[in-house]
UniProtKB/Swiss-Prot annotation:
Listed name of the protein: 3-deoxy-manno-octulosonate cytidylyltransferase
Keyword Cytoplasm found: yes
Gene: kdsB
Cited function: Activates KDO (a required 8-carbon sugar) for incorporation into bacterial lipopolysaccharide in Gram-negative bacteria.
Main localization (coarse): cytoplasm
Enzyme Commission identifier(s): 2.7.7.38
Amino acid sequence: MKAVILIPARLESSRLERKMLADLEGEPLIVRTWRQAMRSTLAERVVVATDSRDIASVLEERGAEVVMTSPSASCGTERIAEAARNIEGDVFVNLQGDEPLISPDTIDLVLSPFFAADPPDCSTLVFALRPDEREQIEDPHIVKALLDRKGNALYFSRSPVPFMRNNTPSLVFYRHVGMYAFGRDVLQQFAALPVSMLEAAESLEQLRLLENGFSIRCVITTLDQPGVNTAEDLELVRSILRKESRS
């Protein structure tokens, strides 16, 4: 089983301009994400897929492997599917470029179902939330996941799901962690499918898989590692890195 990590990276971002090149204690954000990915023990190769020469240049200067992709991709998974067509591998991880604190163990965790019996079409990660963590549950920028008893995804939503008509203290909500692993054929099938109705409604690419009958195995992680979507996120990550450098 040959696993490859693909990191989609576009320069423009609606909430944080040119965030992939934002400085994080002396290194661009995308470089820190790539360095963390290189520490995975299950993946044999790490490739950044981008449509930006600015991003490609800063990575290539540091020895990273980069593939240039079309600017027309509607989502990160379409971008990595384009790159994967010319890359040998059995399973591909879609690791977002804005995850500079991602743990190599977390990457290996999302890959783990593919190294076990009965691998899924796709795997992803979820993080448990308590019912009283209402701010996160109600935040539309935090995607919630519904799981069946076998750990497969039933649905993903920006809304609080399930709706709590009755008080159920033992109910666990799951926050989706946006990293995926795909079997090679499933990744290409995903890219060939049109944007689905629910995907467009929620602006969640993983719903394209569910609407078309593919399975998504959800692996529970206990590591809460912040990504970078806003200026506030960027400052949080900078403060974490400063603390780590002093320890």
